[in-house]
Amino acid sequence: MGSSNKKKKEKKKDFNKAKLKVGKAKAKAANFTDTSFKSKSIVVNQHTLAALDGVDLVGLFKQHLNQAINSKSDKLRQEALVQLTKDLSSKPIFNPVGVPNLLTKLLPLITDSVANVRTNFLKLLRALPPSDVAPHVEKILMYIRGGMTHLSTEIRSDTLSVLDWLIDVCPDETVSCPGGWLKTMNSFSSMLGWNPSVASTLSVKGWTSATKTSLNKVSKKNGEAQAKQITTLAKFLEAGFRPETPLPYDEQRYWDSIYRMPTTPNPFAYLNLWGAQRDEDGEMYPDRISRQQVFERKWRAAIKTGVMGAKQEGGVIGRAASVLDKVLRTAEEGGKKVVEEQKIEEVEEAEA
């Protein structure tokens, strides 16, 4: 009996209302947690994983690399790229897989569907040393040309930012590698709708029934995108038409170039000894004169016609077209000087 009464009292206790007395605090619950404490934290502006003991840094780098490529989570891909950028920005640079493997795996992110992933990938590219990027310009341009003709306006715009970076760090390699000159010009033609065949028809007959095909739609946002395309084209042409600065004679460098082992990969790429046969678009144009000759023959009429139309639109597009027009006029004047100098040299050689 005693035990049963005790159980009844315990059950009844759960339903009894507690009587509050003046001056006494309310009783604390059985599951009460004290949250009145204050936490202390240490903020570190910069830190590196190299300071951690017992951590497989190489394995961690490869894990971040795999996450950046294969993760289905957009946020995880962004965080992995941020961590890789930190490793590449550290001093000394921490890159256990090498730049060739890094680029091979990450270059498809140029056309990633998430804007933040593309932005963080561009930050990673900017952390790479230019000397390590130069041997891989041809491969990078292949992905850039794919992004330039993408259906998404945002992806095309971000791809142009990658091309701007490549021109900044490796201007000569960008315009002189196989396919770097004409194939990239073809991509600009697809973006802007400046077709060489249409331009030649306009110049001969004065009119044509051909329609202008462009990846840009008429809107304020796409107007800004087209202005960026024209600006990047001007930058690309400026790099291609830049006067070549002759190196002063150095006897040691002269003999080294003949007898020593080359220090750059594939130094005889211009001969194309073992590669597939190249067409005109895939050919190398290693000097300013060859680039200018093929541009005059194939692209000047189309670019001039496009610039005239862009100037008439005014606004940001018109301003960008004015910059491009200035580059074309400067290149034309420089080309005339080069031709005159060549004629003088030929005359002097003939007289000698």
From Swiss-Prot:
The record's subcellular locations are: Nucleus
Q: Which domain of life is it from?
A: Eukaryota
One cellular component term from this protein's GO annotations in UniProt: rixosome complex
Set out the biological process GO terms recorded for this chain's protein.
rRNA processing
Is Magnesium among this UniProt entry's keywords?
no
What's in the keyword line of the UniProt record? Nucleus, Ribosome biogenesis, rRNA processing
Q: What InterPro entries does the entry give?
A: ARM-like (IPR011989), ARM-type_fold (IPR016024), Ipi1_N (IPR024679)
| Sequence similarity | Belongs to the IPI1/TEX10 family.
Its job: Component of the RIX1 complex required for processing of ITS2 sequences from 35S pre-rRNA.
Q: How does it assemble?
A: Component of the RIX1 complex, composed of rrm-9/ipi1, rix1/ipi2 and ipi3 in a 1:2:2 stoichiometry. The complex interacts (via rix1) with mdn1 (via its hexameric AAA ATPase ring) and the pre-60S ribosome particles.
| Designated name of the protein | Pre-rRNA-processing protein ipi1
* Organism listed in the record: Neurospora crassa (strain ATCC 24698 / 74-OR23-1A / CBS 708.71 / DSM 1257 / FGSC 987)
